[in-house]
Curated annotation (Swiss-Prot):
Gene label: gcvH
UniProtKB keywords: Lipoyl
UniProt-listed CDD domains: GCS_H
Chain's role: The glycine cleavage system catalyzes the degradation of glycine. The H protein shuttles the methylamine group of glycine from the P protein to the T protein.
Record organism: Enterobacter sp. (strain 638)
Stored InterPro entries: 2-oxoA_DH_lipoyl-BS, Biotin_lipoyl, GCV_H, GCV_H/Fam206, GCV_H_sub, Single_hybrid_motif
Sequence ranges assigned to domain Lipoyl-binding in this UniProt record: 24-106
Range of residues in the leader sequence: none
One Pfam family, short name: GCV_H
Assembly, per entry: The glycine cleavage system is composed of four proteins: P, T, L and H.
Record's cofactor remark: Binds 1 lipoyl cofactor covalently.
Protein name, UniProt field: Glycine cleavage system H protein
Length: 129
Protein backbone atom coordinates (compact mmCIF):
# COMPACT_ATOMS: atom_id res chain seq x y z
CA UNK A 1 0.00 0.00 0.00
CA UNK A 2 1.16 3.51 -0.80
CA UNK A 3 2.42 5.91 1.84
CA UNK A 4 -0.45 8.23 2.96
CA UNK A 5 0.88 10.87 5.40
CA UNK A 6 -1.70 11.62 8.10
CA UNK A 7 -1.15 15.39 8.17
CA UNK A 8 -2.17 15.98 4.54
CA UNK A 9 -5.53 16.45 2.81
CA UNK A 10 -6.25 14.56 -0.43
CA UNK A 11 -8.38 14.84 -3.55
CA UNK A 12 -10.09 11.93 -5.28
CA UNK A 13 -7.83 12.72 -8.26
CA UNK A 14 -4.74 11.86 -6.16
CA UNK A 15 -3.43 15.33 -5.36
CA UNK A 16 -2.32 16.15 -1.82
CA UNK A 17 -2.51 19.47 0.02
CA UNK A 18 -0.38 20.65 2.97
CA UNK A 19 -1.03 23.86 4.93
CA UNK A 20 2.07 26.01 5.36
CA UNK A 21 2.89 28.47 8.16
CA UNK A 22 2.17 31.46 5.90
CA UNK A 23 -1.39 30.27 5.23
CA UNK A 24 -0.71 29.00 1.71
CA UNK A 25 -1.04 25.36 0.67
CA UNK A 26 1.53 23.20 -1.06
CA UNK A 27 0.15 20.79 -3.67
CA UNK A 28 1.62 17.68 -5.24
CA UNK A 29 0.59 14.26 -6.49
CA UNK A 30 0.42 11.29 -4.18
CA UNK A 31 2.81 8.38 -4.02
CA UNK A 32 0.02 6.24 -5.50
CA UNK A 33 -0.35 8.59 -8.49
CA UNK A 34 3.38 8.69 -9.24
CA UNK A 35 3.56 4.89 -8.98
CA UNK A 36 0.79 4.58 -11.59
CA UNK A 37 2.45 7.11 -13.90
CA UNK A 38 5.97 5.72 -13.67
CA UNK A 39 9.20 7.64 -14.23
CA UNK A 40 8.59 11.37 -14.74
CA UNK A 41 10.22 13.00 -17.75
CA UNK A 42 8.60 16.47 -17.64
CA UNK A 43 6.26 18.53 -15.47
CA UNK A 44 4.39 21.41 -17.10
CA UNK A 45 3.92 23.90 -14.25
CA UNK A 46 1.17 26.53 -13.95
CA UNK A 47 1.97 30.24 -14.16
CA UNK A 48 2.39 32.08 -10.86
CA UNK A 49 -0.45 34.56 -10.45
CA UNK A 50 -3.00 32.37 -12.23
CA UNK A 51 -6.38 32.05 -10.52
CA UNK A 52 -7.85 28.55 -10.66
CA UNK A 53 -11.09 26.91 -9.56
CA UNK A 54 -11.22 23.61 -7.71
CA UNK A 55 -11.07 20.82 -10.27
CA UNK A 56 -9.34 22.91 -12.97
CA UNK A 57 -6.45 21.19 -14.71
CA UNK A 58 -3.51 23.47 -14.00
CA UNK A 59 -0.40 21.36 -14.57
CA UNK A 60 0.64 18.25 -16.49
CA UNK A 61 2.88 15.40 -15.35
CA UNK A 62 4.48 13.56 -18.25
CA UNK A 63 6.00 10.16 -17.61
CA UNK A 64 7.44 7.39 -19.73
CA UNK A 65 3.93 5.85 -19.70
CA UNK A 66 1.52 8.77 -20.09
CA UNK A 67 0.73 12.44 -19.65
CA UNK A 68 -1.66 13.16 -16.82
CA UNK A 69 -3.42 16.37 -15.85
CA UNK A 70 -2.88 17.67 -12.33
CA UNK A 71 -5.95 19.36 -10.91
CA UNK A 72 -6.30 22.21 -8.43
CA UNK A 73 -7.72 20.59 -5.29
CA UNK A 74 -9.09 23.98 -4.16
CA UNK A 75 -9.86 27.34 -5.75
CA UNK A 76 -7.35 30.14 -5.37
CA UNK A 77 -4.27 31.85 -6.75
CA UNK A 78 -1.08 30.02 -7.71
CA UNK A 79 1.60 31.77 -5.63
CA UNK A 80 4.67 29.60 -6.35
CA UNK A 81 5.81 26.67 -8.48
CA UNK A 82 8.56 24.13 -7.91
CA UNK A 83 11.14 25.29 -10.47
CA UNK A 84 13.42 22.38 -9.47
CA UNK A 85 11.08 20.10 -11.44
CA UNK A 86 12.17 21.76 -14.70
CA UNK A 87 15.58 20.11 -14.41
CA UNK A 88 14.65 17.22 -12.10
CA UNK A 89 11.10 15.96 -12.77
CA UNK A 90 12.08 12.67 -11.12
CA UNK A 91 11.70 14.41 -7.72
CA UNK A 92 7.98 13.69 -8.12
CA UNK A 93 8.88 9.98 -8.07
CA UNK A 94 11.60 9.96 -5.44
CA UNK A 95 10.01 12.37 -2.96
CA UNK A 96 6.37 13.12 -3.86
CA UNK A 97 5.47 14.63 -0.46
CA UNK A 98 8.45 16.97 0.02
CA UNK A 99 10.95 17.90 -2.72
CA UNK A 100 8.55 16.73 -5.45
CA UNK A 101 5.79 19.27 -4.68
CA UNK A 102 4.30 20.96 -7.76
CA UNK A 103 2.77 24.32 -6.82
CA UNK A 104 1.60 26.47 -3.93
CA UNK A 105 -1.85 28.02 -3.81
CA UNK A 106 -3.55 30.66 -1.68
CA UNK A 107 -6.97 29.11 -1.08
CA UNK A 108 -9.99 31.31 -1.80
CA UNK A 109 -12.30 29.28 0.46
CA UNK A 110 -11.15 27.28 3.48
CA UNK A 111 -14.38 25.25 3.28
CA UNK A 112 -13.00 23.63 0.11
CA UNK A 113 -9.94 22.52 2.07
CA UNK A 114 -12.10 21.02 4.80
CA UNK A 115 -14.14 19.14 2.17
CA UNK A 116 -11.07 17.24 0.94
CA UNK A 117 -10.34 13.70 2.09
CA UNK A 118 -8.31 13.06 5.23
CA UNK A 119 -5.66 10.32 5.22
CA UNK A 120 -8.08 7.64 6.45
CA UNK A 121 -10.64 8.40 3.73
CA UNK A 122 -7.94 8.57 1.05
CA UNK A 123 -6.47 5.23 2.14
CA UNK A 124 -9.98 3.73 1.91
CA UNK A 125 -10.32 5.15 -1.61
CA UNK A 126 -7.07 3.46 -2.63
CA UNK A 127 -8.24 0.12 -1.23
CA UNK A 128 -11.35 0.32 -3.41
CA UNK A 129 -9.51 1.14 -6.65
Amino acid sequence: MSNVPAELKYSKEHEWLRKEADGTYTVGITEHAQELLGDMVFVDLPDVGTTVSAGDDCAVAESVKAASDIYAPVSGEIVAVNDALSDSPELVNSDPYTDGWIFKIRAADEAEVEALLDATAYAALLENE
